[in-house]
Amino acid sequence: MGKISTELAIFVIFLILVVLWGLFIKTPVDKEPTVNNELKVCGIYVQFENGTSDYEVETILENYNMTVNYSIEYNNRNMADDCYIMLDKDERDVRRELSEEMKEENQDWMVSSPSHVVRKGDYYVIMVSEQAINDETFLAILEKYDIRLKKSVWCYIRFEKPDGTRYWIPEEDAIRIKNELENNESVFSVHIGYIYDQ
């Protein structure tokens, strides 16, 4: 009996030591955040203000840390929001009148979601629908306040390999480029183009 109790006591002491060792020894933990490698970006759509030339687009893009080759499709027509108006932040009368007339005539002249209204300095850039361009009441309000209807320039920046074939960058890099570009005065918005055929 004494031999069994001695073996049991040694086994219990061994288990206690293993438990204490497990409590006090830190196991290595991967502290790097996991990145979703499946989200790949093949290009970005950039909306520039009216009158931005292809040379200016190239100059603006050269100032950003583009880590891959790219080509530019200038004045791309794949995006819907082509026309816009710029209103001073203090021009509440214009915004109120446009809003009232839009409700009265049951028309959708402006795209007024927060993602379609861009603040640039002291101005709001408001995207205008195709319907408004041909609406006499809308155009009369713009003329009354001497506001010009402008057409934005859309460019598609396609990421490429040196041989010109399609390439991609990680979403993380695309978001960094997007944020940097949106700080430029000539850029109204940037949209990321994902690859879905993976």
Swiss-Prot record:
Origin superkingdom: Archaea
Family: Belongs to the UPF0228 family.
Protein's UniProt name: UPF0228 protein MA_4032
Organism: Methanosarcina acetivorans (strain ATCC 35395 / DSM 2834 / JCM 12185 / C2A)
UniProt lineage: Archaea, Methanobacteriati, Methanobacteriota, Stenosarchaea group, Methanomicrobia
